[in-house]
């Protein structure tokens, strides 16, 4: 990996990326309300479970395959698989989340003129666009490899979940850093599992997350949009 590719992925994984990630908890807040999360240890366990049991089987392998589609510029496969991912979201909140963040990232890519004109036209035609599809586009535009792209995406997800824990539990900054450090190995394992997953084995089945997300839609007091 070149320094330019590394910096591009650090940019994409940054919480400063203006796509609204900070406003979503992906069910974390609902799990807290259900008393599944109570402290730093249970927050770490919840985030670890989401990474190894959900992302590693669904979002990360999907991202890897979309990255390959962008490198090959297979517009038909991109559209078909993007539509499948959007349809796989199990609640209105989770669907709005991936659509809003995907749209914001796609707009950013277009405004910064990342990628060639033909691929930018394909990107613009994907409506709605899921976040992993847009993230894969941005990574492909910088010639990033699959392993580093997935690691950046997974780290950004862990960091955002940890940020939600700091605000909602609440936890201190040191407790949050301990969670991130504790999950470094899990990120590596999740990436390896995702890279070994063929397209027909991508699995987004996560009933507990779907139920909690649906409950969050009518939760009395909320900090986050999901």
Swiss-Prot record:
Q: Which GO terms describe its cellular component?
A: cytoplasm
Give the Gene3D superfamilies listed for this entry: Urease accessory protein UreF
Pfam families listed in its UniProt record? UreF
Q: What InterPro entries has UniProt attached to this entry?
A: UreF, UreF_sf
Q: Which domain of life is it from?
A: Bacteria
Q: How does it assemble?
A: UreD, UreF and UreG form a complex that acts as a GTP-hydrolysis-dependent molecular chaperone, activating the urease apoprotein by helping to assemble the nickel containing metallocenter of UreC. The UreE protein probably delivers the nickel.
Concerning PANTHER family, the annotation shows: UREASE ACCESSORY PROTEIN F
The name on file for this protein is Urease accessory protein UreF
């Amino acid at each position: 990996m070149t320094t330019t590719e590394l910096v591009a992925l650090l940019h994409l994984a940054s919480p400063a990326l203006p796509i609204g990630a900070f406003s979503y908890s992906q069910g974390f807040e609902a799990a807290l309300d259900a008393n599944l999360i109570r402290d730093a240890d249970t927050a770490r366990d919840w985030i670890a479970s989401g990474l190894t049991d959900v992302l590693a089987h669904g979002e990360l392998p999907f991202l890897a395959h979309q990255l390959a589609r962008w490198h090959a510029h297979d517009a038909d496969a991109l559209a078909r698989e993007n539509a499948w991912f959007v349809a796989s979201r199990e609640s209105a909140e989770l669907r709005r989340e991936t659509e809003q963040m995907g749209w914001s990232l796609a707009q950013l890519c277009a405004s910064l003129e990342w990628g060639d004109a033909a691929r930018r036209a394909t990107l613009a035609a994907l409506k709605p666009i899921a976040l992993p599809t847009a993230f894969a586009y941005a990574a492909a535009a910088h010639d990033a490899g699959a392993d580093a792209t997935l690691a950046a995406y997974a780290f950004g997800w862990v960091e955002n979940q940890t940020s939600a824990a700091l605000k909602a539990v609440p936890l201190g900054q040191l407790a949050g850093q301990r969670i991130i450090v504790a999950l470094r190995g899990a990120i590596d394992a999740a990436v390896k599992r995702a890279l070994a997953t063929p397209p027909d084995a991508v699995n987004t089945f996560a009933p507990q997350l779907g139920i909690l997300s649906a409950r969050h839609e009518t939760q009395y007091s909320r900090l986050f949009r999901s």
